[in-house]
Structures are given as C-alpha cells and as structure tokens.
Amino acid sequence: MNEKQKLESGQVHPSDKKSEKDYSKYFEAVYIPPSLKDAKKRGKEAVTYHNDFKISEQFKGLGDGRKFYIRTYGCQMNEHDTEVMAGIFMALGYEATNSVDDANVILLNTCAIRENAENKVFGELGHLKALKKNNPDLILGVCGCMSQEESVVNRILKKHPFVDMIFGTHNIHRLPELLSEAYLSKEMVVEVWSKEGDVIENLPKVRNGKIKGWVNIMYGCDKFCTYCIVPYTRGKERSRRPEDIIQEVRRLASEGYKEITLLGQNVNAYGKDFEDMTYGLGDLMDELRKIDIPRIRFTTSHPRDFDDRLIEVLAKGGNLLDHIHLPVQSGSSEVLKLMARKYDRERYMELVRKIKEAMPNASLTTDIIVGFPNETDEQFEETLSLYREVEFDSAYTFIYSPREGTPAAKMKDNVPMRVKKERLQRLNALVNEISAKKMKEYEGKVVEVLVEGESKNNPDILAGYTEKSKLVNFKGPKEAIGKIVRVKIQQAKTWSLDGEMVGEAIEVK
C-alpha cells in the first residue's frame, strides 16, 4: 500500500511524526554546500531557456477548498518570487489569505543576506510550531535563499522537524510537484538544487497591486564579493532574452501599470552572458523607453558593470528615471580590495562624476557596510568623507554580518562590536543630516507623485513617491490613487515630504 492509499484509507495522517529518513542523499545528489572554489567553476554549464511552463493536469484542483499564505523576507527579488509562487498557487486552485490562522499552506520565503534576517525566520518557525500542532493538516514550507545554505537546512532538520517542505531559489517552478509530495508523504520533502536553474518563462504571477510592477531581467551574481552569500544562493548570472522582457513590459503597460522596476542581483551585468549577441542593460533600456509606461527604474547596480552606454541611454530621460542606487559598501580602497569589489575609491568617484555630468539632477543612493573585519578608524573616516563628497540622497547602512561559507567569514576580526555600533551611529547621523538637507530643497516646489494609496498613519492622507523615490504625503481624493499627480511641497522632513495637490485630481501622465 503506497502513501496515497494509506492516506485515503485513514491509516496514516499527514501530520504523523516525521520518520528518521536519511537526508544525506539530497546533499550528495542535489545539494552542495557553499564553496567559492566550486561555485567559480559553474560558468561552464550552458543555461537553457524554457518557454513552455504549464500546470500539469494531474495537479489542477490540488488547491480546491484550500488557502495559502506566503510571508516574504528580504529584497525585491524575493517579493517578485512570491508573486510567482502566488500565481502558481492560484493556478492550482488555492485561495490567498492574509491570516496564518486561515491558511492550509504557509510558506516562508527567506533571505540569507544577514544573520538578523535568518534569526527572524527561525523565530517565526517557533511561533508557527503551535499552529502546526493545533492544525496537523497544515503544510509548512521554507523556501528562498536560506534554503540554499546547508547549515540552515541541517538546523531545520534537527530543530524544526515539523516543517513539511524545503525548497530553494532554483526550482520554484516545481512548486506543484513539491506540494503534491508534501500532501502524500509523512516525511519532510527536501529539494534544494545547488546548480543554478534555467530561465523559465511564462510562469504565472499574482502581482501586488496594479500600479507598480517588478520585472526580472536576470538572475544570479558572479561577482563573489568576499562578504556576500548571494552568488551561492542565487547562482550564476543568467539573463532573460530581451524579447521576453519587452513583451512583459508592454503587457504591463497595456494593463495600466504606471511604473516598472527591472530586477537583478546585479542588474547592470545584464546581457554579459549572451553568446549570440552584444547586448547590455543600456541597449535594453533604450528599447524599453519607447514603451508607453510613465516610469522605469532598475535595481540593484554594481559599480563595476555600470558602463558608459548605460549612462548615455539614461541621460535621454523621458520615462527612464535618474534615481540610481549605486552601492559603494566602503569609502576605503583597502577595504574595497578585501571585499573583492574590483574597484577602488577613485574609480567609484569617477563613475559618480560621469553620472552627474550626464544627468546633473540625478539622485544617488547607496549601501554601506561598517565594521568589516579589521576596518580601522582611518578607513571608516574615508567612508564618511566619501559620503560627504557624493552627498547621497539616502543609504542602507549595516554592521558587517558574517555569512558561513564566504571568505570574509574566515577573516580574523579585531573590531569590537561596541566600536562597530558607534561607527554605525556616526554614519547614520551623517546620512540623516544630508537627507534632511536635500529634502529641505523641495519646499515650495511642485513635484510629480505616483499615488500608491492611503498613508499608513492616516487614512485621510494619500501617499506616493516622486521620480526620485521621495515619499510624499498629501490630502487628496481617493480617485487620485494609481495616478501621477502634481503636489506642491509645504514641509520637508528627514525621510518624507508633506504637501497639497495642485488643481483637480487630473493625471499628468
């Protein structure tokens, strides 16, 4: 009698205790722990493009009468992966729910970029244990970047055996098969591919709203910064074909979307893996700017791949926004070398000069890590001086977080946590100071705002973002939601602007 027959006969319940299954085969067959040496060999394998994704007839109706809930941690790529998984769930017949208490399936789409992100997930698993105990039929899964780390999978196997399924970033398209296996088996379903996946087109999506849309243009990263786990969790760089991207953007434009963001772990390396043509992000954006959609952004950039062609195209303006996120990570050339960023302070500043020369009003934001192993006071001061020199509009700032399997995690570190926290406080004070100064310049000006909805703090106030991604709160009619309207700024705060709508609720774009 197989597992399905046992379930149907009532002899086995899907919540029965997991068996002492030997999981070693998964790691020998489809899972390899992060290895810089092994990962750098991966470029020899060709990427295959699949345009024929569809839900198998045997899985249709799998979700009838069932609800799903996905909790997402981390970056925009994860947000978009969640949209894809939601699309697959809906195609299987599931209904979405905003409550874990109502869900028949709960997925945690995880982030591995920092230890704090992982701690949040393990904390959430602890909370969900009681829910699983009270509802044994609940399917609980962990997916995303954390699942690509062998240490994480081992921890789940040992300490959270109530989890039903674990899968990674490369096999999201196999969600129907994994769900079916989870229902039919009393054992934990583990399928984590260390080999980066192929490029799968035609995946269903349930997008979050009808105003702004994410569009993946590439996957993975080949840069291997010494502190970063992403090349291991997301695989090698793989670009979608331009015709598929253009078709998707045109479809979003026809559906009324006002803004799209092109996504990639290293978005401006787009096209470098093409063997049949020379075609980069600048070429793609030069085609996308002709599509009737008001705003086009991209993230995240690596300074190493930000070329003159891209600057030339961005300078054409129009619907290509001059808000550029350009992570510097450190202002010290010595630290940048230890990070394996492959540029120094001077090269970064030269890139900033080129951008500002071509686009004088460009808005630059960045990422900065403080407390990298053995960072000296002088090296940290170089970061502060670079920040003052560039005058970034804002920055995401972090204390260095060791990631197991990365070269930096093996470095000796003589910087006490107390010093790292002090440096972060000093950096954040500078970030706030310059942000407040730049926001003050908006007072009295009229800006175009894409209205996204009601303010989180006041339902009588509308909220939206400018082309340079500044949050604007203002009074206006609900009909303005989803439109781009003019707002006169009356008061500037450190991280937001308050204003009033100019004229009637007439869309300007």
From Swiss-Prot:
Protein name (record): tRNA-2-methylthio-N(6)-dimethylallyladenosine synthase
Family of the protein in this entry: Belongs to the methylthiotransferase family. MiaB subfamily.
Kindly list the places in or outside the cell where this protein is found, as annotated in its UniProt entry. Cytoplasm
Task: Output the Pfam families linked to this UniProt entry.
Answer: Radical_SAM, TRAM, UPF0004
Q: Which domain of life is it from?
A: Bacteria
Organism listed in the record:
Bacillus subtilis (strain 168)
Q: Quote a single Gene Ontology cellular component term.
A: cytosol
Q: Where does [4Fe-4S] cluster 1 bind?
A: 75, 111, 145
